[in-house]
Amino acid sequence: VKPFIGLGGLQHGFTDQDTVIQDPGYFRLPGVRYRWGDYTLRTAIGGGHGETNLQRAIFQSCDTFFYDLGYRMGIDTIHSFLGQFGFGQNFTLDVGYARTGVLPSREWKQATRNEPWYPGDTINSSIGQGYMWATPLQLATATAIAANKGVVVKPRMLAAVDGEPFEPQDLNPVADVQIDNPDNWRYIEESMTMVVHRPYSQVFRDYGTAYEAIARADREMSYKMAGKSGSAQVVSIAQDILQSEDIDVSDLNKDHALFVAYAPAQHPTIKPQIAVAVFVENGQHGSSVAGPVAKAVIDAYLLDILQIDFTSLATDPDALLSFDAGRAPQQSTDPAAGFLTLANAEHEGHVHD
């Protein structure tokens, strides 16, 4: 959920593209000794990410930046903003049994737990932990909305009945997501693209969390993909928060691996055509385990089914005419044209990242 928290922070003025924080590797509430550790650093570099802005916080998956941002945003802002992307709701057109997940709020906790909302609950929610949980279908839907720069495309199961195209009626229409500064959409897309495409920087000593795994994939990347790695909790990460070095869990208790992505990203002429959410049970690492699966699915759709030759499009303007004419859904001024979402709706989990 980090890209969505970041976009919400930009929209509501709690951060901007130039804001930099000093990340020591943990976050503390004012006057509280307890530390929320940076989960992504426990088995990585340790010691914090140092100076970090929102873009680096996304492509490096910096928990501490989002602890700070989420705390300042507050749960009311987080709840209302993430709800626009389908979290906590059934956004499908014809899947009545789809799980709604939980997008927690003060009212939800009081009603279900008979407890007040605490600041620590907000910090957990800022990285998709705590009481929040979502299905892969919700993650794919939210990712599609981000790819479409706010245009809501609701997923559906049924395409045709007895060979006749079927258009389900939208009984619960929702408004598109409106962002005051359109450049913030570009900024978030650029940040998610760096998750996949940013190589190691000698200057900043960092790289995109999925860069190495995607670079080792079987097929060379001929297009840009925007993505975000994550994990879904199976057991509590309290030990991680306390910076424990001796965590021993069975394979069945390992976190599930998650990766969301859409493509093509940052293309001058072709709008995003596909969004995916990959869920690998007990896979632990979203970037290295789920990331290559996401790329394989997107490769199959863009390169094999639509047969888009991105190399030709980059060098031959006339190639775009061939692509538009018969190999893919008609391109138009509607950013939702030809958009597809893919996901597995049967699993659920507490989403980390």
Predicted features and spans:
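Short, highly charged C-terminal tails/helix-capping segments
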Residues: 310-334
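Short, conserved micro-motifs enriched in small and acidic residues
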Residues: 1, 130-137, 284-292
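C-terminal, active-site-flanking charged/polar segments
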Residues: 270, 284-287, 291-308
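Beta-lactam-recognizing serine transpeptidase/beta-lactamase-like catalytic domain environment
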Residues: 4-278, 330-353
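Intrinsically disordered, low-complexity Ser/Thr/Pro-rich tracts
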Residues: 304, 319-322, 341-346
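Ligand-site clamp/hinge motif
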Residues: 279-283
